[in-house]
Amino acid sequence: MKLFDYAPLSLAWREFLQSEFKKPYFLEIEKRYLEALKSPKTIFPKSSHLFYALNLTPPCAVKIILLGQDPYHSIYLENSQELPVAMGLSFGVNPNAPIPPSLRNIFKELHANLGVPIPCCGDLSAWAKRGMLLLNAILSVEKKQAASHQYIGWENFSDRILARLFETTSPLIVVLLGKVAQKKIALIPKNKHIIITAPHPSPLARGFLGSGVFTSIQKAYREIYRKDFDFSL
């Protein structure tokens, strides 16, 4: 079985990225991920949600990109069952999962900037459906092992996704939180897209709260689309 048998990817994205799937780097990603999936190790998010960010936001609908690093590797308990916090969206979590500190800070800054009520649920699917691509640079992780799937090569693929999107004629709003995400600035054509940077929202970093990042996103969105982005959840 092939990768897309385990991890469905929408036709729109398969057509958009079709030139990538036979390249040696992608075949190596497929091989390594499937080996990990078939091993005794538990891999997050569930394979059905590996490409969830792409499936919720077709390439023609992308207006904002919020780039994350890699999925949450933690679990939570629901009816005595261990479930992954990760759901395939950068910073977002499964609807019943506790809200992680980074996402809690995102909600605090959003409220401080735009007055959006702080949600009680960390599912960001609504943003994705409105045109915010919530893409992680690394798409999978081993349970309780942070950054454990760097070796798979996902960043080669996510870089190609970004590069293909940056080739589009419409201006995109690219939000890069933290130094790791900001390394992607080199991929972005100058004077074509709007780049917004801020510190990482983790409590271990400093400067995210008070950065005004959502004010900047909304200002850019208004300039392009003459309306506000709906941040409600």
Curated annotation (Swiss-Prot):
This enzyme's EC code(s): 3.2.2.27
Keyword Hydrolase (UniProt): yes
Any GO molecular function: uracil DNA N-glycosylase activity
SUPFAM superfamilies: Uracil-DNA glycosylase-like
Keyword Hydrolase: yes
InterPro entries: UDG_fam1, Ura-DNA_Glyclase_AS, Uracil-DNA_glycosylase-like, Uracil-DNA_glycosylase-like_sf
Entries under PROSITE patterns matching the protein: U_DNA_GLYCOSYLASE (PS00130)
UniProtKB keywords: Cytoplasm, DNA damage, DNA repair, Hydrolase
Reactions mediated catalytically: Hydrolyzes single-stranded DNA or mismatched double-stranded DNA and polynucleotides, releasing free uracil
Gene Ontology biological process terms in this record: base-excision repair, AP site formation via deaminated base removal
One Pfam family hit: UDG
First-level EC class: hydrolase
GO cellular component terms, A-Z: cytoplasm
Active site, renumbered: D70
Localization (cell): Cytoplasm
Family, per entry: Belongs to the uracil-DNA glycosylase (UDG) superfamily. UNG family.
Alphabetized PANTHER family for the sequence: URACIL-DNA GLYCOSYLASE (PTHR11264:SF0)
Function according to Swiss-Prot or TrEMBL: Excises uracil residues from the DNA which can arise as a result of misincorporation of dUMP residues by DNA polymerase or due to deamination of cytosine.
Name the record gives this protein: Uracil-DNA glycosylase
Lineage of producing organism: Bacteria, Pseudomonadati, Campylobacterota, Epsilonproteobacteria, Campylobacterales
Gene that this polypeptide is encoded by: ung
